[in-house]
């Protein structure tokens, strides 16, 4: 089993548990260059809010898109967009990534901005 398959296996297990809870989930994905966050409806078929370092405004604001500062900016932005849509409680889906570095920074900034998980 390679690194990606292991991560997907971990993500599947967590997503199955979140689906049982019928919770809106905050999904985080990271690549070597960018960080992405989406708030997905409990049925899994609708993206309620999204933010990523690919967006021009974020890239201009943070400069380097692959560090913790960029993840903090994404966390604040996704929380603001979710709260605008009336979502305050979410389940955090780390997509099999270790809760460390950019993933943890995004989660902490989203909590500080008003999301509860």
From Swiss-Prot:
Pfam families given in the database record? Ribosomal_L18p
Q: Per UniProt, which keywords does this protein have?
A: Ribonucleoprotein, Ribosomal protein, RNA-binding, rRNA-binding
Q: What are the GO cellular component annotations? A: cytosolic large ribosomal subunit
Q: Which GO terms describe its biological process?
A: translation
Gene3D superfamilies for the chain: 3.30.420.100
Q: Which GO MF terms does the UniProt record name? A: 5S rRNA binding; structural constituent of ribosome
Family of this protein: Belongs to the universal ribosomal protein uL18 family.
Which HAMAP family does the protein's record reference?
A: Ribosomal_uL18_B
Assembly information from the UniProt record: Part of the 50S ribosomal subunit; part of the 5S rRNA/L5/L18/L25 subcomplex. Contacts the 5S and 23S rRNAs.
- What does the protein in this record do? This is one of the proteins that bind and probably mediate the attachment of the 5S RNA into the large ribosomal subunit, where it forms part of the central protuberance.
The name this protein carries in UniProt is: Large ribosomal subunit protein uL18
Say which species the protein is native to.
Aliivibrio salmonicida (strain LFI1238) (Vibrio salmonicida (strain LFI1238))
